[in-house]
Amino acid sequence: MAKNNEGTGKDSIDKRFARIESDPKFRAPKQKNLKIKLDDRFSKQDLEYKRKAKVDKYGRRIGTAPGKEEKDFEKYFTKESSESAAEESDKEDSSVAKLDRARGEVPADYVSSSDEESSSESEADSDDATAESDEEVEIEEEKPESGDPSKVLAVVNLDWDHVKCADLLVAFNSFVPEGGKIERVAIYPSEFGKERMQREEVEGPPREVFKSKKDKKAKQDDDDEIGLKDLYEQGDAEKDYDSKALRRYQLERLRYYYAVVYCNNVATAEAIYQNCDGTEYESTANMFDLRYVPEGVTFDDEPREECASVPKDYKPVQFSTSALQHSQVKLTWDETPADRVEMAKRAFSQKEIEDMDFKAYLASDSEESEADDNSEAKNKLRSLVSSVKVADKPLFADESDEEEADVQITFTPGLEGGEAKEEDAEEENILEKLKRKEKERRKKRKERVKELKKQAEEEKKSSKKEKHASKSESEQKSENDKRAELELLMMEDDENSQSINSSAHFNMNDILRSEKERGKKSKYQKKDKIVEDDFKPDLNDPRFKEVFEDRDFAIDPSQPEFKETAAMKQILQERRKRSSKSASKKRKTDEQSDSAMDSAGDLKGLVAKLKRKGKKPKL
């Protein structure tokens, strides 16, 4: 049903539907009339909905979110006592509304002006307290006046746990005009930050950050259920931090430091101020808050860090400040610095280790260690003093009788040298130790390179000597062969002239190598290894007839003792030839004997036939 006008009066409604306003059939029922009314007959235990455990199966406390049973109970049931109390309050409101103030009638809770003033003061105090506890802490919205422009800028309210001088220098260099330059950037601790950091070194974060015992007890007494899925989504299911106090503390940490940007002129500072003030630094939720520093203001505090140029290996740090953009704030008081974590994960080269400043990552010595060092130094001095003697007596001995004697001082250089070495070793820091080890490693490497060079030169010399030696060996071998031939020619006949000479006339290994080389292709043959074998066996010698004919002297080429030489090939060939001749000769004799036997058999058969014929009777 569309309405012609936006008014709610009866005149604006169509006359055809005017009955809807007065007819009770079209009146919507009230929500409280739909609920089931419960009287006093129902006890508290009967009305009590199902209770759940206070802790989960892991022992963690369950949160206080209202359960489904409680919501259903409030939706469908109501008690008559609560309903009657609500009706009485409605009647009182109506009676108060009917009071005639012109006749001097006043409500029962009327308060005089004097009482109202005193009560208003107390209420204002309580309201301020509650408002102060409930309000969310924010960075100051009303920024002070910028003042006269100067060439020095101050940067405040940033996450100084992650923001470094190099980050600010890179960000501001993008807005430097032509001819402008940023001389340096320094980060100083504020007075507020020094006081708070000094307190945190002893006490840690303020106690307001943590929940009070009353709040914890109230949490423990709560019986409302929470689903197992919600429990896993929440993680620990309960945190010991007060979220508002923690947010306030994290925002206060932004004021622990401030940065000072030194520009070469006022125009550069103005350009940076106009372009960067109020803008977000990357996507970290940190807004640049810039202020002009008046001329002549000096900073006596020692800066946390300084930067005049962008490092070569600069890499921006990816971070976000949870207190500025998240509902769940993270406590960063004991968080490990990001650059230290990155340094622990990286694998540095040797050059980076030498150039690194380890003092930024090493903790300072405590007073106790300094006291121990002082006591050790005193003991060393005392031992050195006691070693000085005069006439075989200690120089500083307590003697009442002073006797004149020739002064003779004895020193112990060995002890002094040892003590000095120990002092040098103790005074050497980590960086010097690394440099010393690197020098030793380089020295060893150079010595090793020298040794390798010497070995290479010696090998070259030895190879040259071997070449000359190989030539001389071949010449010497030829001379030895000639000498052996002469010895054989000049050898006298003696008793053992018929036996084999002790100096053999051939070398089987040389013959085998020569045969192997002959089997290769001509381009791969080594001519110096080929030996001309002039030995020719006498195959017709009757003394060696059985070697070629008797099977007891058969030669098996598959045996490993077989040596395939030219003479051996001739012997095998002769043996095959003779074996084939003997086989053919034997075959002929066998054929002749067979033919003779056949002829003799025929003759005997003829004689037997004639005898049989002669024995037959005549008719």
From Swiss-Prot:
It is found in: Nucleus, Nucleolus. Residues 8-26, 67-82, 92-106, 196-212, 448-461, 469-486, 525-543 have a biased composition (Basic and acidic residues). Residues 497-506 have a biased composition (Polar residues). The keyword RNA-binding applies. One of its GO terms (molecular function) is RNA binding. Belongs to the ESF1 family. InterPro entries: Esf1, NUC153, RRM_ESF1. GO terms for biological process: rRNA processing. This is Pre-rRNA-processing protein ESF1. It comes from the Eukaryota. Pfam families: NUC153 (PF08159), RRM_ESF1 (PF25121). GO terms for cellular component: nucleolus; small-subunit processome. Residues 1-32, 53-151, 196-228, 395-543, 555-619 are annotated as: Disordered. Residues 114-143 have a biased composition (Acidic residues). Residues 438-447, 575-587, 609-619 have a biased composition (Basic residues). Residues 418-476 form a coiled coil. It comes from Eremothecium gossypii (strain ATCC 10895 / CBS 109.51 / FGSC 9923 / NRRL Y-1056) (Yeast). Keywords: Coiled coil, Nucleus, Ribosome biogenesis, RNA-binding, rRNA processing. Involved in the 18S rRNA synthesis. Required for the early cleavages at sites A0, A1 and A2.
